[in-house]
Amino acid sequence: EPCGLTQMISMRYGAVPVVRATGGLRDTIFDVDTEKDRAAWEVDGSTDWKVTGDATNGFSFEGTDAGGLEYALDRALDSYYNDRAWFRKFQERIMRQDWSWNRPALDYIELYYSAIRG
């Protein structure tokens, strides 16, 4: 499934996603090593957010080859086995991410009001 709710539901329960960066998965999973800036923009919605890496939420890879998948899995497993404290904090952080419709709904309401006033 290129997107859907699976990854967002699983994160809520502590699963750390390892995904191929395609479709909606690319829109919702931000690689812990390479996508801090994009995660800060997409999750927090603001470029003035202090980029600390707190918005990253998984491990991703490009392409469809076995090497890409292996690389992403190796990074995930390495962090689990070699830095368990970091991994647990990472799980807690992604469990707190809000993927509800609250923020998008408010964004749309603000857009509609600005169009009416404009």
Q: How should these model regions be labeled?
A:
Residues E1-K89, M95-R96:
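Catalytic binding pocket for nucleotide-activated donors in carbohydrate/polymer assembly enzymes
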Residues N102-G118:
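C-terminal alpha-helical cap of glycosyltransferases
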